[in-house]
């Protein structure tokens, strides 16, 4: 049987107190809507329709290529939101999943089980329910004397007895598609909210003797709908625990999972060790047997096997096998370290490529440079690559030795096996195998110190 999906992503999310549409708020580095769409994609959906409304164009811009959408111009309730998908779905034969775009914790496995249960029960509607420790705010599942689902009552419409019920509606359903769209033509706004409730179709089905099933969630956390920043933080914490658990069972050591923040798209190889207070974001790849020490931050980068990142920041950069950085180094966007490169403490590199075995041990800035193999940078070296308007490139060939406190005024080229003397200001190209000296000659004025303010006598 064909499977379809309607993802509700039209709401403003007033309680978020944000200019950003609610479904675009991120959990573990990815929007809530993206999490939901990923889970939906795991159950072989024939047609997926996203209902957009508030800031529709911003939401549409984030959708995967080819995703169908419908704009809900007026937000008149969940029933209305589903009904406007009729032109795309009403004539289809099959079962339709309806799910909110602000439920980032629900998994593809759960949605697959929900479809299986729906088909096994031969139901017209199947509700994903959960037993809530505190059901306040949720719609309640009302069952009859035979324990069959009778209806769903929203919090604002519930009486005292109904409010005491702990089985809640998670807001995720599967319906027989044609029955759903037929029933949606019969719902009204006769309720406390003055809206078209999707849940009213349950009573319509029940009155004509159709089967209503309820599948209870094993993990209540999956039911979390995010309506404010508090719930957003809860979703973040739960997602982080899931992510960290998955990495650990796959052979990654997390010294302190409670302070380790790893986004959902990060890949990490076995035998890697990650210490406390580490953040790894975006589309980051980390190979095998990598050490990442306390306080490091890595974003949208590639760190290959046998590397070390010690108390450092790595952004949009690539570290090849056996390279190491830190402590307190900063690889800025566009940096590429070849194999066995060493970048030490208080070194900043931007938009540069360093060849195999090159070393920049301390207090160095390298920007917009192409550096060969086994080049050594002495402490205090900088490439002066910016004239206030334009950036300029520096080329340094294999085996060059850059003396401490050298200032390299780009653009220029330093040749193979060349050496710059300590303290030099390099303003011209340096040929292969040349020694460059770009500093004033030292002069010692004997006895002059006695006339200086610092002098304290013999």
UniProtKB/Swiss-Prot annotation:
CDD domains: GT2_GlmU_N_bac, LbH_GlmU_C. Its EC number is 2.7.7.23, 2.3.1.157. Acetyl-CoA binds at residues 379, 404, 422, 439. Binds 1 Mg(2+) ion per subunit. UDP-N-acetyl-alpha-D-glucosamine binds at residues 8-11, 22, 72, 77-78, 139, 154, 169, 227, 332, 350, 365, 376. Keywords: Acyltransferase, Cell shape, Cell wall biogenesis/degradation, Cytoplasm, Magnesium, Metal-binding, Multifunctional enzyme, Nucleotidyltransferase, Peptidoglycan synthesis, Repeat, Transferase. The keyword Metal-binding applies. One of its GO terms (cellular component) is membrane. The keyword Transcription does not apply. Pathway: Nucleotide-sugar biosynthesis; UDP-N-acetyl-alpha-D-glucosamine biosynthesis; N-acetyl-alpha-D-glucosamine 1-phosphate from alpha-D-glucosamine 6-phosphate (route II): step 2/2; Nucleotide-sugar biosynthesis; UDP-N-acetyl-alpha-D-glucosamine biosynthesis; UDP-N-acetyl-alpha-D-glucosamine from N-acetyl-alpha-D-glucosamine 1-phosphate: step 1/1; Bacterial outer membrane biogenesis; LPS lipid A biosynthesis. Residues 251-458 are annotated as: N-acetyltransferase. The active site is at residue 362. Its main location: cytoplasm. Residues 230-250 are annotated as: Linker. It is found in: Cytoplasm. Its cofactor is Mg(2+). HAMAP family: GlmU. NCBIfam families: glmU, PRK14354.1. Homotrimer. This is Bifunctional protein GlmU. It comes from Lactococcus lactis subsp. cremoris (strain MG1363). The lineage of its organism: Bacteria, Bacillati, Bacillota, Bacilli, Lactobacillales.
């Amino acid at each position: 049987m064909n499977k379809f999906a309607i993802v509700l992503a039209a709401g403003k999310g007033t309680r978020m107190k944000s200019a950003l549409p609610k479904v675009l708020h991120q959990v573990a580095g990815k929007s809530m809507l993206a999490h939901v769409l990923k889970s939906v994609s795991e159950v072989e959906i024939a047609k997926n329709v996203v209902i957009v409304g508030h800031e529709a164009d911003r939401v549409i811009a984030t959708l995967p290529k080819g995703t169908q959408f419908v704009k809900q111009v007026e937000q008149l309730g969940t029933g209305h939101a589903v009904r406007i998908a009729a032109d795309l779905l009403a004539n289809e034969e099959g079962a339709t999943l309806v799910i909110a775009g602000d439920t980032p914790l629900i998994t593809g496995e759960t949605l697959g089980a929900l479809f299986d249960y729906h088909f096994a029960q031969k139901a017209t509607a199947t509700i994903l329910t959960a037993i809530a420790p505190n059901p306040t705010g949720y719609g309640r599942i009302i069952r009859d004397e035979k324990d069959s689902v009778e209806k769903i009552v929203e919090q604002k419409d519930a009486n005292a007895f109904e409010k005491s019920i702990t089985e809640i509606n998670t807001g995720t359903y599967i319906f027989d598609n044609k029955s759903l769209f037929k029933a949606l033509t019969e719902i009204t706004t006769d309720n406390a909210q003055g809206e078209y409730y999707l849940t009213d179709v349950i009573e319509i089905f029940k009155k004509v003797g159709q089967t209503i099933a309820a599948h209870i969630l094993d993990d209540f956390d999956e039911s979390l709908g995010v309506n404010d920043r508090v719930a957003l933080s809860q979703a973040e914490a739960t997602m982080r625990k899931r992510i960290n658990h998955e990495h650990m069972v796959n052979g990654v050591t997390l010294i302190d999972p409670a302070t380790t923040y790893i986004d959902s798209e990060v890949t990490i190889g076995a035998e890697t060790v990650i210490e406390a207070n580490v953040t790894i974001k975006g589309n980051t790849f980390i190979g095998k047997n990598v050490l990442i020490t306390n306080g490091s931050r890595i974003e949208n980068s590639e760190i290959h096997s046998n590397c070390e990142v010690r108390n450092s920041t790595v952004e949009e950069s690539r570290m090849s096998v056996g390279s190491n950085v830190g402590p307190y180094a900063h690889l800025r966007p566009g940096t590429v370290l070849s194999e066995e490169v060493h970048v030490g403490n208080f070194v900043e590199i931007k938009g540069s490529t360093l060849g195999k075995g090159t070393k920049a041990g301390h207090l160095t800035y390298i920007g917009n440079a192409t550096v060969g193999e086994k080049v050594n940078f002495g402490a205090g070296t900088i490439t002066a690559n910016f004239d206030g308007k334009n950036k300029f490139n520096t080329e340094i060939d294999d085996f060059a030795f850059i003396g401490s406190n050298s200032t390299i005024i780009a653009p220029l080229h330093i040749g193979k096996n060349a050496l710059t003397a300590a303290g030099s200001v390099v303003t011209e190209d340096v040929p292969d195998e040349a020694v460059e000296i770009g500093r004033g000659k030292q002069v010692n004025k004997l006895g002059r110190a006695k006339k200086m303010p610092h002098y304290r006598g013999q």
